[in-house]
Amino acid sequence: MALHDENVVWHAHAVTREDREALHGHKGAVVWFTGLSGSGKSTIAGALEEALHKLGISTWLLDGDNVRHGLCSDLGFSDADRKENIRRVGEVANLMVDAGLVVLTAFISPHRAERQMVRERIGEGRFIEVFVDTPLATCEARDPKGLYKKARAGELRNFTGIDSVYETPESPEVHLDGEQLVTNLVAQLLDLLRQGDIIRS
């Protein structure tokens, strides 16, 4: 810990998370999408956000590529940088949950330890891990950004699923078949959010 930590004290605010949730009419939570590149994380997260918005739910979508344009623009793809990337995203997501939002995150987040770190930061009941399980062959066939082709050609190192490991979730709240229709997957997620009392029926 830094030497100045003892002088940094958390400042509590008069307006609480519960106050903000009451204003929004729903609980704050994180829906954490994890899976290989091309698995469909961003597509499903975007469709879910659209569906939630239509229901009057206050949301925010944190996307893996987007945060690297600003918040994490100084980070690369080493194990240490990936860990820091997820730590920062977890902290931002936690602030947004405190604001009463339903936060959707779409990150490969290949390591269980980092996902567990965010889970512990957010708290049980507010962290919903969604494993988008799509076969590597399907992800490669989709290859929307041409990254698998570059990785296979040796032009891109430390690419998850090719020469960098992806640790599949052991007990995610939701296990989605990434080859199914997005509309069906969104319906499944909405049901889960209702059952978890995150959003109203």
Curated annotation (Swiss-Prot):
EC number(s) given by UniProt: 2.7.1.25
Lineage: superkingdom: Bacteria
GO biological process, one term: sulfate assimilation
Alphabetized HAMAP family for the sequence: Adenylyl_sulf_kinase (MF_00065)
Sorted UniProt keywords: ATP-binding, Kinase, Nucleotide-binding, Phosphoprotein, Transferase
Phylogenetic classification of the source organism: Bacteria, Pseudomonadati, Pseudomonadota, Gammaproteobacteria, Enterobacterales
Protein name as catalogued: Adenylyl-sulfate kinase
Catalytic activity reported: adenosine 5'-phosphosulfate + ATP = 3'-phosphoadenylyl sulfate + ADP + H(+)
Pathway the protein contributes to: Sulfur metabolism; hydrogen sulfide biosynthesis; sulfite from sulfate: step 2/3
Family: Belongs to the APS kinase family.
Gene3D superfamilies per record: P-loop containing nucleotide triphosphate hydrolases
Record-linked NCBIfam families: apsK, PRK03846.1
Organism, as annotated: Citrobacter koseri (strain ATCC BAA-895 / CDC 4225-83 / SGSC4696)
Functional summary from the UniProt entry: Catalyzes the synthesis of activated sulfate.
GO terms, molecular function: adenylylsulfate kinase activity; ATP binding
Active-site annotation: 109 (phosphoserine intermediate)
Annotated ATP binding sites: 35-42
